[in-house]
Amino acid sequence: MKNKINLSYYGNDGKGCEYDIYENGEVTIYFMLNGIEISDVDVDLECLGCSTIEQLVIDLLNFGYKINL
């Protein structure tokens, strides 16, 4: 099992997005509707314009995402 950080954001309309950020720099983005996954995509940090995991986490927190423990 890979170690990961999960961050999510959901609007009042039930639409949302979740990021699984793995320690090796891989990222899976899930697009959600009313708690159900409707699509996902695998990318790396560079595709998101970040050079470190910390930078991506800070950017997402600044955009209103919440860390899921």
Where do the PLM segments sit?
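Acidic, low-complexity, intrinsically disordered interaction modules
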Residues: 8-64
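Short intrinsically disordered terminal tails
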Residues: 1-3, 65-69
